[in-house]
Amino acid sequence: MSQVSICLLSEAGADPGALSILAERWGLVSDEQSIMALVLTPERLELRKRDEPKLGGIYVDFVAGTLAHRRKFGGGRGEAVAKAVGIKKGYLPRVVDATAGLGRDAFVLAALGCHVQMLERNPVVAALLDDGLRRGYQDAEIGPWLRERLTLLHASSLTALAEIEPRPEVVYLDPMYPHRQKSALVKKEMRVFQSLVGADEDADGLLAPARALATKRVVVKRPDYAEPLAGIAAQAAVTTKSHRFDLYMPLL
């Protein structure tokens, strides 16, 4: 993985030595001119857009906030993502989430009992995920099962999908796509994320290796207005008001 330049900041009360360890681990080079900043606070690691401070920080939190609410009060196995990967009574597929992002869908699947391996190639996003996992693993309530079911591999999906063993039943893809939704959360996250990583220009190339790896199905999450990944029509789909989960059979 090549090095990435980003402004690295440590707030008062945070361990000052932790930032240099983090930079070395993830191949980050501090650039004080960068508009993107990775900020170590006493509580967590955050990504901030320095020229738009009102956007606040983006961070991964598996313990509290929206994911905790979704785990406790969401649709459970009735959630569209659960239906899409094929969760049924007595069947919990092993899943590779090849475009992990902030890990939301991966966490939902892990909370339902699936073993999920997240792949994330961007070192800044991987660092945020790793920080969220570390705090989640330490939590008394979710830590025991989270450690067992949700893991992270910092790698390019294009290469990792050809090397993962054993083969999972499901490969899950949610490549970044320009959002039309105007919700505050989506706007904030998309603006910060697209400033950091840009669009997934090579996303079309993920479908074939994903279908070669999965033993049961590939699930591709798309906005309802988006064309199929790689222009290949899905064999089935699970739809919601704003998204669809396109389903593809493996390439045997």
UniProtKB/Swiss-Prot annotation:
Entry GO CC: cytoplasm
InterPro entries for the chain: 16SrRNA_methylTrfase_J, SAM-dependent_MTases_sf
Main localization of the protein described in the UniProt heading: cytoplasm
Locations listed in the record: Cytoplasm
Keywords: Cytoplasm, Methyltransferase, rRNA processing, S-adenosyl-L-methionine, Transferase
Keyword Cytoplasm tagged: yes
Pfam families referenced in this protein's UniProt entry, alphabetically: SAM_MT
Catalytic activity annotation: guanosine(1516) in 16S rRNA + S-adenosyl-L-methionine = N(2)-methylguanosine(1516) in 16S rRNA + S-adenosyl-L-homocysteine + H(+)
Binding site for S-adenosyl-L-methionine: 104-105, 120-121, 156-157, 174
Entry keyword annotation includes Cell membrane: no
Record-listed E.C. numbers: 2.1.1.242
Domain of life: Bacteria
GO molecular function, one term: rRNA (guanine-N2-)-methyltransferase activity
HAMAP family with a match to the protein in the record: 16SrRNA_methyltr_J (MF_01523)
Homology family: Belongs to the methyltransferase superfamily. RsmJ family.
Task of the protein: Specifically methylates the guanosine in position 1516 of 16S rRNA.
Name of the molecule in the record: Ribosomal RNA small subunit methyltransferase J
Species assigned in the record: Yersinia enterocolitica serotype O:8 / biotype 1B (strain NCTC 13174 / 8081)
